[in-house]
From Swiss-Prot:
One of its GO terms (biological process) is cell adhesion. Pfam families: Dicty_CAD (PF05720). Belongs to the csb family. It comes from Dictyostelium discoideum. InterPro entries: Dicty_CAD. It comes from the Eukaryota. This is Uncharacterized protein csb family protein DDB_G0271196.
Amino acid sequence: MAEEYHQLKITIFTDKGRSTISGFEYPQPILPYPAPYTFRFFHYDIEGPNLTNKEFKVKTGKIEYKGEEFDIPPSSKGSWRREDNLFDLISVTIYPSRQPKKVFHY
């Protein structure tokens, strides 16, 4: 069975400004509550400050996936790091400060 990949876009506002990453991603397993959102991007574009290898605190943000928008609660934290230079992968993990009103799911 072939994997199905979808476009995903994350926009985050931090004290450094607005950063956006968009591209194709595939799901990562998650367990804690509220569950962190973990994404691994390939064929991506970055707008704004590149947060690679940085941890950040979210002022506001949203996830756009398959035509739907999911808010990232204020005061959430996250990390953005280069995963693999050979395949040019970036992992973004967001730890919601509380359970979002509309929970992101695949």
